[in-house]
Each structure stands twice: as structure tokens, then as C-alpha cells.
Curated annotation (Swiss-Prot):
Protein localization: Cytoplasm; Nucleus
Protein name listed in UniProt: COP9 signalosome complex subunit 5
One GO CC term, this protein: cytoplasm
GO molecular function, one term: metallopeptidase activity
Region (Disordered): 320-341
């Protein structure tokens, strides 16, 4: 078995990255409209500000492949510490979309839980933008990005305040969060884009930034995640590439494809996996304590808030009984009303079951197992490609007759 050449290995690695992250190649007609920057049109959009009257105005963010790679590499270089950078792009009002064409890192001081931009970072930002315009890059800053190493893509309280301030003074602005640890574990870029609601605004939709889909949040971050989950909303994220992006990606993968084959996510991400297992054990211990401390048999299993919910249900029944008594028994249950009440009760129990501690722990365990399987499959595939050299039979030996045993 012949080992694959370096060029074919680089092509396979790049193709795998593009497939996992659903990167859309642009056609020649679309290419001109996206990369052509109309300064006057952008100024007119900034003057009109249609997003001021609709907090949900922007629905999508489209990120170029080169900008995505730069942000992921920057996030990965930070290790356990958060990083921060800015993104340049333009506005598409017709499609309610923000385009991210490029990104650049900021020299900031980051910790394991927060990142702070100092005066040096602001000076660097101004100089970078000035030099960009000197070389013909007229795109304005359309957002900022930072990393959450190991704890998912969402906005903390500090992030919400930062994003809200940016939207107040230099809107349109979008916040992008990348988790480099989960990116390595899953093989797909773990990324989220968010915009905050104005202060005091109450969304008519029950879906906030924290409720768009289930996320595995560490126990130490759950409180911060839940408190601010309804103060922002997620945007759909798409990735695209041009022919020039393709050439740049070729150069990048020709340089780094060996690292893809020589490294294993099981080894490079072992600290993250260990922390996830420890967090899962803490969640299960907390769940077990909640079960042991249940005071009522009617409480939903494994739910710390089930007692309060059952009180609300019981109170609702008492109110209904009192209403029927006061009305002289005229408000009798009809079959349609009974069915509707039963359906509502079933839906409420399903919601409580999904939000229960044991359900979340089960989802976290399934996610950990899936990521471990991904790492094992990658290691097995590499072993099969480069170590199992099965001998190919020669034509002479292949054509030789098989002796017949009597």
C-alpha cells in the first residue's frame, strides 16, 4: 500500500475542513457583488440605520474562509486564556446579513474567564484601520470576536455589556465567540454569533441566546449563562470562500497538513477532556443530592425546581375549583378543555424533563462519548493509512493454479 503524497494529504485535510464547516464556494457572478465595496452605499446604509427600529433586524452572519481560519488559529494560540480581535466587513440590508471579510487580533490581556482591552489595544486598532485604508481595504469594523476555551459559545455578563456598548456607539456590530477546545474535539469549528437587545427590551419570542439549542455549560458557568441568556439572540452563521481564498487555503494546508496527521485530538485535548469528565461528575453528584433531598413524592424526578412547579400546578387547580364553585358549577370541564389541559400538562412535564439536571448530565455524557469516538476513529484511520502495508500479489503468483489436496 503506497502512502499518499503530501499534496494529496493536504488536499484531503482541506477538503475535510471545508466539508465539516459547510464552506460555500462562491460563483463568479456572486463573487463580484460580495467583494466589491461600495463606500457611498455603505454610508447611506449607516445613515438610514434600519436596525434601530427592529432589535431582530440582522439574522445572518457570513464569514469568509480566511477570516474564519485566522480567528480559529488565534483562539487556539491562546490556550486556556481568552483572546480578542476585531472583524472587518460590510452590511447587506436586503438580506439582513453582516459580511465578515477579514479579521485581526488585538494585543489584550486575557485570563481563563475574561479578556480586557487596554489603551495599547485601542491604539493598535486605530493604527491598523488607518493602514488598511491606505492599502485600499475600505471595510469598516463590523464586530469583535473572542474565545471561550472549553465552555461553549454564549455571552457572559461582561460580554453582554461590551456588546451592548458597541451596538450603542458603533452599530451595526456583532459579537462572535469561538471555543477552540471543542473545535479540536469535534473536528468542526464551534462558533456562535450574537447581538444584544436594547436595555429594557423584552423579546416577544421565548428563544434567547441561551435557548437556541442545548449547550454543555460547566457547572461554574451555569449561573452566569442563565442570568443573561434572554438579553441577546443568536444569528445564523455561514462560511464562504472565493477562488483567492482557495489559493490561500492551499498554501496554509501545504504548511500545516503534517500537524493534522501527526497530532491526535485525544492527546492534544486531554486536559479539556479531563475537565469535562470532572464537571460531569460534579453535575451527577449534585443531581444525586437533589434526589435524596426531595420532600414530596409528587416532585418530578431529578429536578430541583420540581417542588415549586408542583406547587404552581396545585395552586392552579385550587383557583379553577374556586372559580367553578363561585360560578355555581356552570364552568364544567368539556372534553375539548380536558384534552387541552392534558396536552399542556404533558408539554410542561416534557420541558421540565429536558431542563432537568439528569437530562443535562445525560446529554453531556453523550457529547463526551461522541467526541472520544471521533478521536478514536481518527487515530484508527491514520493507523490504517500508514501502518497496515498489505502486500499486493504479483501477477505471477496471482495466476498460479491452486494445488488440489486429495
Amino acid at each position: 500500500m503506497t502512502a499518499p503524497s503530501s499534496s494529496s494529504s493536504a488536499s484531503m485535510a482541506r477538503a475535510n475542513f471545508e466539508l465539516n464547516n459547510a464552506i460555500i464556494p462562491l460563483s463568479s457572478t456572486t463573487l463580484d457583488s460580495i467583494f466589491a465595496y461600495d463606500n457611498e452605499a455603505q454610508r447611506a446604509i449607516l445613515h438610514a440605520q434600519p436596525w434601530k427600529t427592529d432589535p431582530h433586524f440582522f439574522q445572518k452572519v457570513r464569514i469568509s474562509a480566511v477570516a474564519l481560519i485566522k480567528m480559529v488559529m488565534h483562539a487556539r494560540s491562546g490556550g486556556i486564556y481568552e483572546i480578542m480581535g476585531l472583524m472587518q466587513g460590510k452590511i447587506d440590508v436586503e438580506n439582513r446579513t453582516l459580511y465578515v471579510m477579514d479579521s485581526f487580533a488585538l494585543p489584550v490581556e486575557g485570563t481563563e474567564t475574561r479578556v480586557n482591552a487596554q489603551n495599547e489595544a485601542y491604539e493598535y486598532m486605530v493604527q491598523y484601520l488607518d493602514h488598511s485604508k491606505e492599502v485600499g481595504r475600505l471595510e469598516n469594523v463590523v464586530g469583535w470576536y473572542h474565545s471561550h476555551p472549553g465552555y461553549g459559545c454564549w455571552l457572559s455578563g461582561i460580554d453582554v455589556n461590551t456588546q451592548r456598548t458597541n451596538q450603542q456607539f458603533q452599530d451595526p456590530f456583532v459579537a462572535i465567540v469561538i471555543d477552540p477546545n471543542r473545535t479540536i474535539s469535534s473536528g468542526k469549528v464551534d462558533i456562535g454569533a450574537f447581538r444584544t437587545f436594547p436595555e429594557g427590551y423584552t423579546s416577544s419570542s421565548s428563544i434567547g441566546g441561551g435557548d437556541s439549542e442545548y449547550q454543555s455549560i460547566p457547572l461554574s458557568k451555569i449561573e452566569d449563562f442563565g442570568v443573561h441568556a434572554n438579553e441577546y439572540y443568536p444569528l445564523e452563521v455561514e462560511h464562504f470562500k472565493s477562488s483567492l481564498d482557495g489559493k490561500l487555503l492551499d498554501l496554509l494546508w501545504n504548511k500545516y497538513w503534517q500537524n493534522t496527521l501527526s497530532q491526535s485530538p485525544l492527546v492534544s485535548n486531554r486536559a479539556y477532556t479531563t475537565s469535562q469528565i470532572r464537571d460531569l461528575a460534579d453535575k451527577l453528584a449534585q443531581t444525586n443530592a437533589a434526589v435524596l433531598n426531595r420532600n414530596s413524592v409528587s416532585s418530578a424526578p431529578f429536578t430541583t425546581t420540581a417542588g415549586a412547579a408542583s406547587v404552581r400546578i396545585g395552586a392552579g387547580k385550587d383557583v379553577a375549583a374556586e372559580t367553578e364553585q363561585n360560578s355555581g358549577g356552570s364552568a364544567k370541564d368539556t372534553p375539548a378543555g380536558t384534552a387541552q389541559d392534558a396536552a399542556g400538562l404533558v408539554k410542561e412535564f416534557e420541558q421540565r424533563s429536558k431542563m432537568s439536571a439528569i437530562s443535562r448530565a445525560s446529554n453531556d455524557a453523550a457529547k463526551l462519548a461522541s467526541e472520544a469516538n471521533h478521536g478514536l476513529l481518527a487515530s484508527q484511520l491514520k493507523h490504517t493509512l500508514f501502518h497496515n502495508h498489505t502486500a499486493t500479489p504479483t501477477p505471477a503468483s496471482a495466476s498460479a493454479p491452486t494445488p488440489i489436496r486429495l
